[in-house]
């Protein structure tokens, strides 16, 4: 949310973070999960898939739209007319969606945010496949709101190879 610079008021009302208990229940379900089973967990036992304004739609990843219309909706992006930022947001949504479709297995583990959020997020983007010069602007737009050095996890003077260079100066 920090990388996307989501307004805190929007997070509280329109694009809440994931419901952890629901996610844990889904993770414990059988490997070959059907859409009906997923729907049962998403709506917590009730079927609100025909209701346009279900309370479950106000999450960053809105699966209500999958059950209601057959489309996936990402609600975490702020409005903008900047073409580069629009491209970055679309590319991020497509990359995460593609990984979800193509990934053979998942491990439910939160990636800790290190003292250098820019480096942590950059490695996440690289794991998504946003590598190379064609994604340079996408990475730049997505990381512009994060503090830290995107190239080094820790202060670069801490690495032995860089200490040697500092001593030569």
Language model features by range: what are they?
Residues 1-169:
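C-terminal accessory/tail domains of diverse enzymes
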